[in-house]
Amino acid sequence: MFDDFLADLRKPSIEKYDWMNDVELILGTKENLTQAIDECIASEIYGCDIETTGLDNRVFDGRTVDSIVGIGLAPTPDKAYYFPIGHRAGSEYNIPWSMVGKEFGRLFHPDTKANPVFHNIAFDSVFLEYNGFFPLGVDRWDDHKKWEDTLIVKYLLNPRQKGGRGLKALSDQLCGMKMIELNELIPDEKIKDYATLDPSWEPCVWYAAADPLCTLRVWNILRGQYVDAPEHSDSIYNLEKMCLVSVSWMHRSRVYVDRNRALESCKEGQRLWWESLLEVYDGASEILGRDITPNYLRIMKGEIKGAINIFEPDDVGNDSKMSYKIRVDEARKEAKRNYPDPVQVISKNVALVGKEAGTEKIDFPIVYDIMSPQQLGLLFRELKVPNLIASEKSGQVVTAGDVLDDVIEKAEKDFPFMGKVKNLRFLSKALGQYLIPFVEDVGKDGTLKPRFDQFAADTGRFSCKSTSKPWEVKDGGCRVPFQGIPAYGKDKDKKPAIISYMRDCIASRGDGWWLVAIDYAGVELRLVTNLSKEPLWVKAFFECSDCGKQYPQEMNDDNIPKATPTYCVCGSDRIGDLHTVTAVAFYGENAKNLPDWKDKRGNGKGCNFALSYGGTGKAVQRTIGCSAQEGEEKYRKFTGTYKTLAKWWTHQHDFGRKHGYVKTAFGRVQPLPDINEGDFRKKSKDERKAVNGPVQGTSADITKLAMSLIYKEVKKRGWFDKLKMILTVHDEIVFEIHEDVIGEAIPVLTNLMSRNKGIANQGWAVPLLVDVEIGKTWGVPYDLKDLKRGYKEKLVPDGVDEEGKKKYKEIQVPVPESLGRIFYEQGSEEQAPKKEVKSEPSKPVYTIGELTKEEARNVALWLVENEGGIVQYNNKDVSALFI
């Protein structure tokens, strides 16, 4: 008794809010469990929430790392139960697992009519699925009609709101019901384990039962707001729910990392970073006429006798994790302690930042730590770098990425070392955010778990958050923001080779497995064309810009535009080359024959991307590096050429001003709260969003719908052990596929992504196309189009030549034998239809059997030469597989 008295004294004092006296918050027991389940089943919808030992819902060996402690149910907005299941304190109150399985099996049965409503089901459902709650399987969570989520509704109502989406904030804001915080119950920051609480302690029940009750009340309010707002559509809510299931599958699939390759990439990256850092210091010191190297860098260089923190690029990934960041920190501490920098300053008059005229006197340090943004800004001022921008809050020079890139681009001619500053920052980011975490954070199974958030961006696009939370970093949690990994495309000379190092670290996980990356080819320009109906661009998408051949604009039986061939009869792959169309509009048809045509086409490409989504002459100036006058001239020429596109911009602006929002092709609302603002900057930003938002948002809707369809198809075909969806980055979805099914799977996936009626039947004139790449790593893919053409080589970075220019080498890319069968294997009739060959004497027929890659190449060339010919296999027309 006395021990109980002392235990009560140690418990914190918790305030019971007034609203809690007006509802029933009940401790669940063996005696009332059946009654509570019956009440939930009898209701149309009930609140549901779980308490856990922690937040780690990663799955190993069929179980989550943390586990369920208890579950809360609210059959009505005025009544809720909390059923303890895994409490260590007060364990005598736990419901026996035999009863849990039986009763919750009834509640979560797929045939149960009543639906649970969660707040963030993405978290709860994984715990429920992998902690023994579903003896009948998990079909309930796969069916988006069987559950609701207040977090999704709140996001869709106001996607631009970045905070205030938590249950406690919503309960207070919408219901006037303040909730108890977990740190009130468990003040110790190191212990956030609900199992340490005794469920017989009333505040434990108040907290846990309030969650489902408040969730149900918030749902009733948010659902009403969503239904009553005519601009919102249930189709988008259902799309987000369907996508959530596929994202959960993707999270469970995880990403395999070749740690040895990552380690070597880290060493090479650190070597490049070290060289770049020294080059920046040498360049700035030469301009200023004094050595600005701080002592911590001298320590790292080994120039200070007796100092211990000497930098070695190979020093990464060992037990001490002495990566460059840690070595910099240690060297700074050593320098501060034993070798402090000189405190003298140099006073100079320099131009005011961001002002047209005027100077001010600044005390500059003798040496600089350019790894510090503040000191880097000071260095720029002493160097008299032009076009610097000052922060409105601090007055210091802004050195953020985009701003700095603009400054560098304008100043690089007079200050060549500025390009080295940009390269140094890129290398620092690549190492710190990607390569080093690839080495240090990989889990015991060799994988990382990216954290994809489908409810972060107002456009609907995914974001991938980095984290430093211990429960997310340890054993495979992910610090890597995958969305930030740049594409390694055709503009290789403009991108540091380290990009390929990042992608090379993502690998297939063993023999027989291949990475397959499928991305929507030029999707945003295709969407701009479809949304604006610009006739010149519609025409261009069916025309070869090299020979001028025009392909027919036809619809299939599902009212989906038929795809154009990848290669023209002339051998060119430039069908739908809008950049050539724009360049010809600027410079004339004869410009194609000029020596600088490549640069002129590049300007056309830059203008397309700068202006298509609502940009101005300033955007042209930034993109192609021209004068302000030329930027405005090109803007006027662009709008004068593409009049329908310009009218669409105006329509979007007018609609946005009238309604305060615009929509994607699928009905997603893009709020524009500032489009009628007096503030020119805010107004201009929302005017750009009125054009750009529907384009990016429609692209996001397409990707999310494709992911949902892919999950269902993989489940239907029983491919979960042969096909994994591991990443979605920009307009690309990355899979890991076993070669046993790869030949069959690729046509299924590409048809789902580009030809499915739900995606492509939007009344569009221009088809969606996808590109397929395959490889053992994400960085060395084999383009499927090239495979069909018989190509075997790929260019990859191979250091630099004597002039410092990047070199490339051809490598042989291995291809699975089963990939050759893609040319003749049949997919399902539903996903990859192939029509019976009909007798058409005017069309030559090429009958094939099983093909080698060289034979497949010859068939493809025959089909190009005999336009309209038929390739026949097993009495089926398989011509489409060679186009």
Residue locations for each model-derived region?
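Mixed-charge, glycine-rich, non-catalytic linkers/tails in nucleic-acid processing enzymes
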Residues: 3, 8, 134-147, 180-349, ...
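Core structural elements
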Residues: 119-120, 207-223, 230-257, 272, ...
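Catalytic palm subdomain of template-directed nucleic-acid polymerases
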Residues: 156-160, 216, 249-273, 616-629, ...
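Acidic, glycine-rich two-metal-ion catalytic cores of nucleic acid-processing enzymes
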Residues: 21-28, 40-79, 88-93, 99, ...
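Active-site-proximal helix-loop-helix substrate-binding element of RNase H-like nuclease domains
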Residues: 2-28, 56, 66-228, 239-240, ...
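Cys/His-rich microdomains that often coordinate metals
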Residues: 550-555, 572-575
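Cysteine-rich micro-motifs
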Residues: 559-573
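Polymerase palm active-site segment centered on the conserved acidic dipeptide of motif C
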Residues: 216, 266-300, 304-305, 638-654, ...
